[in-house]
From Swiss-Prot:
Enzyme type, top EC level: transferase
Keyword annotations: Magnesium, Metal-binding, Transferase
Origin superkingdom: Bacteria
Protein name, entry field: Isoprenyl transferase 1
Higher taxonomy: Bacteria, Bacillati, Cyanobacteriota, Cyanophyceae, Nostocales
Gene that encodes it: uppS1
Amino acid sequence: MTIQQTELQELPLDLKRELLPKHVAVIMDGNGRWAKRQGLPRIMGHKRGVDALKDLLRCCRDWGIQALTAYAFSTENWKRPQEEVEFLMTLFQRVLRQELREMVEENVQIQFVGNLTALPRSLQAEISRSMEETKNNRGIRFSVATNYGGRQEILQACRAIAQKVQQGLLQPDEINEEVFERHLYTAGISDPDLLIRTSGEMRLSNFLLWQMAYGEIYITDTLWPDFDRTEFHRALCAYQQRERRFGKV
């Protein structure tokens, strides 16, 4: 950690605590491009990306942000080279195993969102263990979107609701936003106030399509492995200058 990074362990004076987003989501883009620029294999970009995420999680905790959601693996990521996918599955499992004790000690509550049944069974076991051992923690809520797709999430919610209607457990006129949200992967998690996307790409990439209806979006050209507290500080400064209207004038 640089001197500048150390200085940012406390909430910067130009940020107002009452105006901080309660929930930040991140699309961690640019690991492969970062590795290519460094003349390294793509997998090294993913390893550095894990370090960047760990620092962001601690930064959110240090600065009083209540929730962080990270887009770790999309439903489309299965189309990547098999070697890279297998590495990512192994990396997720290893990081969970190595970091769980520290997460428990730091009062982090871990939650995974997505179609988890399609993941390797060994990874599913680590995911279940991490959620079970941190379920009573009341610090920052850390959600990891894994095998997640926004369209698929909405479709599965519709199917689940339709099945309840068919079974007579729910009446059509009882279906509202609250009922719908209870059937999403993110049930019980507040909508993000701020979505940060790295690497300069300007799209949602099938991430939190329902939940981002009124969220603010911040795009940075910085590649994910280079995203640090200084970059996060810039994102929060930009967020605090915006006026959130939630569809109102």
